[in-house]
Amino acid sequence: MLALYLAPEGRNRLAGKRVLHVSPESILERFVQGAASYETSDPELPGMDHRFDITAIPIEGGGYDAVLCNHVLEHIPNDRAALSELHRILAPGGLAVITLPVIEGWETTYEDPAIDTPELRELYFGRHDHVRYYGRDIRDRIREAGFDLEVFQPSPRQCVEHA
């Protein structure tokens, strides 16, 4: 779905900008490489430009014009700190493209710090490495971190064709 948002306008939107891709997927790199200054970060993946905890980014504020963060926050125990850090490293007017699974029928995010083992997380969140199911209140968390929010909702047809 991120590719749908980035293309075809994504190259123009990111051209000439300094882009940070958090926990990058190689399939998405083609949408920004060659079109922008492009850096990657992940604390575990090999071959990254940076290795840092997304909740404490050791980069000067305002250092990036765009940040791509695709299906990362549902893995981060302190997602509020991560959102604040992503906002901090963006230049004024910068773009953060953040995707995550949201259960639109739920008003409130479901999370419980006591669900802290891979087995329990698999049972409660459907994945051993997820720490929550987001509800609609994620929009408030994003705004509280300082972002202006634009929700991209693919059409049912796009979901069928690209999911």
For the regions a language model picked out, list residue spans one by one:
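A short SAM/SAH-binding and catalytic strip from SAM-dependent methyltransferases
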Residues: 66-77
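S-adenosyl-L-methionine-dependent methyltransferase catalytic module, highlighting the catalytic core
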Residues: 77-163
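N-terminal juxtadomain amphipathic helix
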Residues: 1-16
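Active-site micro-motifs of SAM-dependent methyltransferase domains
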Residues: 56, 74, 104
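A short acidic, Gly/Pro-enriched loop at the edge of an enzyme's catalytic core
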Residues: 55-67
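Class I SAM-dependent methyltransferase SAM/SAH-binding core
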Residues: 14-57
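An acidic- and aromatic-residue-enriched active-site/binding cleft used to recognize and process polar
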Residues: 43, 69, 101-103
